[in-house]
């Protein structure tokens, strides 16, 4: 078993060398404990992903496609976006503690993770990944709902994110603009799922970082109309009503539990 777990350590060490070695001499990060190296790598990767994706996204929809996707008077101000960036950057060091913790758990054999797809085969890999995503979808839905329904959680945690409740205050940069504990709680299902279902290690890490892109997507206020995806059209309604569309990747949970509100139907009512 110890030899098998070494594969995870070797993989995270490779990621550390790849990221940290690109931005600083090894004498700076080499002496750090392995877990702290992982946190620093996750932090650098998270910051880069947030800014690169956010700036490219905003440049495209607010400038290159000005008045195509977003009406001119609905484009958020620079002040609003800078506030979102400030909130996200204060939370980022704390966000990165979660993937660092999950890596530690995996490296120590506390989870059901496997290192190589060949360990289980492609069919099992796809089935396990699908079950993992269902658990994540279910967990995030209920965590998100409780952050609204439990008044102290909303007041002291989730309200930080819901100051952005109109189209002209929402932007891709709002995607990670949470109280640190709020952001961590909503990502916890990714770690809980590792205890319940076998999951490919690299896919797990990739899905956690995909959250940064996904949350940017659902805060751009552009309804993609891709069924059954819980896109920005649905999430914008959530920011307006606070009582609908708690789901994450799909509309499945909201449909099952009666909290779904369709943006197409909403637009039809306004006409």
From Swiss-Prot:
The residue ranges crossing the membrane are 44-64, 120-140, 190-210
Where does the record place it? Endoplasmic reticulum membrane
Where does this chain carry the motif Histidine box-1?
A: 144-148
Q: Which GO terms describe its biological process?
A: sterol biosynthetic process
> Carries keyword Endoplasmic reticulum?
yes
**UniProt short sequence motif Histidine box-3, positions renumbered to this chain:** 235-239
For this chain, one GO molecular function annotation is: C-5 sterol desaturase activity
Ordered alphabetically, the record's keywords are: Endoplasmic reticulum, Iron, Lipid biosynthesis, Lipid metabolism, Membrane, Oxidoreductase, Steroid biosynthesis, Steroid metabolism, Sterol biosynthesis, Sterol metabolism, Transmembrane, Transmembrane helix
* Names of the cofactor(s): Fe cation
| Major localization listed first in the record, in broad terms | endoplasmic reticulum
Reactions accelerated catalytically: a Delta(7)-sterol + 2 Fe(II)-[cytochrome b5] + O2 + 2 H(+) = a Delta(5),Delta(7)-sterol + 2 Fe(III)-[cytochrome b5] + 2 H2O
Q: Give its E.C. classification number.
A: 1.14.19.20
Q: How does it sit in the membrane?
A: Multi-pass membrane protein
What positions carry the motif Histidine box-2? 158-162
Where the record annotates domain Fatty acid hydroxylase, the positions are 130-259
The record's Gene Ontology cellular component field reads: endoplasmic reticulum membrane
Supply the InterPro entries for this chain: Fatty_acid_hydroxylase (IPR006694), Sterol_Desaturase_Related (IPR050307)
| Entry text on domains | The histidine box domains may contain the active site and/or be involved in metal ion binding.
The similarity comment for this entry is: Belongs to the sterol desaturase family.
Q: Which PANTHER family match?
A: STEROL DESATURASE
Q: What does this protein do?
A: Involved in the biosynthesis of sitosterol and campesterol.
- What's this protein's name? Delta(7)-sterol-C5(6)-desaturase
Which species is listed as the source?
A: Nicotiana tabacum
